[in-house]
């Protein structure tokens, strides 16, 4: 490294034939393509060259951040190529030290009545009252050229709007009320379907119990499988249509359905009689007819809001009107008992026993029902020879 000389130097990095535009060494002689000629052979002594300490500056140049060639880069002499940045993006702010790491839960929103009380108070009534204000009507409902400042044309408009608001200004029905209103019918429908499926299994269960009476101690087997129709062994309650026992199974099911219907009607009749909805006139001794003439005027209505009469009037042969009060409950049952007591006088002897039996506790009733259910099949086998006598006794009871 000496002074400026017109002769090229010898040594490492001084060969002009080796292009090295980066200028890694201070004594480097550039190629003639980079203005290194006889007039200006030494580029290091050029007053227009970059200072060597600039190579150590940190910047963004042609070779990436942190390295800037002192004599320009391969991209030329532009400011960006030399590492000169006109605008440097601001560094992000440092993270807060007092903030907890991780995603924090979103806080609950305050209720609407606290954040927007005007939205809660603003309903159809408030809106209608606001429309009655002359200032509001002057803004939204102009008078149509009225010079007096009155808004008489707007009166009809306001009344029309108020009539519309009275019919359409109601709030939207709550979905919870709609859901609860639909839930009740759905539960009723589900309970009805469940009850129907159980009711349909009752005839089959009763049919199985009916057929089991003929096979005590054994498995019920259909007797029609040994006939001309060769079918597999099956229960008499599940006969296929080709089995000769199929018609008997249908007949048993039909009788069972009739018995169930009769029991339902009896239960309904007992329920209506217990509630006093069967105002049957009691049987008056010495008279078997009721009058529809003058005695009708002495019939008083029942107490309360009931529309049934509370007394029954008859007209005996002497012409005097006799009124007997109708029982408020069990009127039909008492009428049947009085009628049976008149036809069969010996039934009056059973009154003390019936009264004692009715006064028994529910535990005794459940015990009697369990005994009848347990001993029923055996009693049927014992009493089956006497079953033909039952119609005879029934006819004697009716026609005596």
UniProtKB/Swiss-Prot annotation:
Free-text description of this protein's post-translational modifications in UniProt: Isoform M is N-terminally acetylated by host at a ratio of 90%, and N-glycosylated by host at the pre-S2 region.
Residues on Virion surface side: 2-181, 275-348, 399-400
Region (Pre-S): 2-174
Subcellular location: Virion membrane
GO biological process, one term: fusion of virus membrane with host endosome membrane
GO terms for cellular component: membrane; viral envelope; virion membrane
Keywords per UniProt: Acetylation, Caveolin-mediated endocytosis of virus by host, Fusion of virus membrane with host endosomal membrane, Fusion of virus membrane with host membrane, Glycoprotein, Host-virus interaction, Lipoprotein, Membrane, Myristate, Transmembrane, Transmembrane helix, Viral attachment to host cell, Viral envelope protein, Viral penetration into host cytoplasm, Virion, Virus endocytosis by host, Virus entry into host cell
Residue segments, region Pre-S1: 2-119
Intervals, Intravirion compartment: 2-253, 203-253, 370-375
TM region(s), chain numbering: 182-202, 254-274, 349-369, 376-398
Applied uses, from the record: Systematic vaccination of individuals at risk of exposure to the virus has been the main method of controlling the morbidity and mortality associated with hepatitis B. The first hepatitis B vaccine was manufactured by the purification and inactivation of HBsAg obtained from the plasma of chronic hepatitis B virus carriers. The vaccine is now produced by recombinant DNA techniques and expression of the S isoform in yeast cells. The pre-S region do not seem to induce strong enough antigenic response.
Lipidation (N-myristoyl glycine): 2
Biased composition (Polar residues): 96-106
Purpose of the protein: The large envelope protein exists in two topological conformations, one which is termed 'external' or Le-HBsAg and the other 'internal' or Li-HBsAg. In its external conformation the protein attaches the virus to cell receptors and thereby initiating infection. This interaction determines the species specificity and liver tropism. This attachment induces virion internalization predominantly through caveolin-mediated endocytosis. The large envelope protein also assures fusion between virion membrane and endosomal membrane. The middle envelope protein plays an important role in the budding of the virion. It is involved in the induction of budding in a nucleocapsid independent way. In this process the majority of envelope proteins bud to form subviral lipoprotein particles of 22 nm of diameter that do not contain a nucleocapsid.
Family of the protein in this entry: Belongs to the orthohepadnavirus major surface antigen family.
Protein name per Swiss-Prot or TrEMBL: Large envelope protein
Organism: Hepatitis B virus genotype B1 (isolate Japan/Yamagata-2/1998)
